[in-house]
Amino acid sequence: HREHEPYIDPSEFDADLKVIDTSLRASQDEIIADDRLSTIRAAIASFGFHLYSIDLRQNSESFENVLTEVFATAHVHPNYDTLREEDKVELLVRELQTPRPLVPRGYRGFSEATQRELDLIAQAAVSVERFGEQMIPHQIISMAQSVSDILEPMVLLKEVGLIQANGQGPTGSIDIIPLFETIDDLQAGAGILRKLWDLPIYRAYLRQRGDIQEVMLGYSDSNKDGGYFAANWALYDAETDLVEVG
């Protein structure tokens, strides 16, 4: 391996281990290859450099509040949270096509709540850079109720480099996962996804993620919302509708 340069990812490290494995077996040193070297390679395959993965998860209302303040600070829109849904989507799509950041790196003039959320996302980007893409594979949006709820965290992830804007559509290593929780949201979930997938920019992102859309359904909140029977019926209907729309 190149002297003094760190491995970019676990597969690069394993490629060097494979060379050692081949050399040992060619020298009839299978005992060594099958012992410690095999154990190291198994650990790399299982844990990479990150040991275990962490999901990002936040409530949709929090994302809206953060973006409202960020957009106002960046003079993009003074009151994002008052926009109609279609206008929100139009603005978010435009931002996902724009490579430039909304605020200068290191800017810390936000409210405490907004700064805390931005710091968390920035730290996630540092962790991915240090330990690899497997470190943080998912962004979960709890209480997802609209297309804009799903696009908002993507704009924030773009702000820290976890999603990149380019001419072919945004790219990134994080799966965007809406969590539909209340009975109303379970019933609306399939329709929300249809509208989301009709957006070329989101379809492009989904395509580079293997054309797989993961969705989460909330069991506890739907039970609290409508009771056991109504919640389970809504969950069954939601699962059926989501399979059909997929």
Where are these regions (language model features)?
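Generic recognition of stable, solvent-exposed alpha-helical segments in well-folded globular domains
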Residues: I8, E12-A15, V19, I32-D35, ...
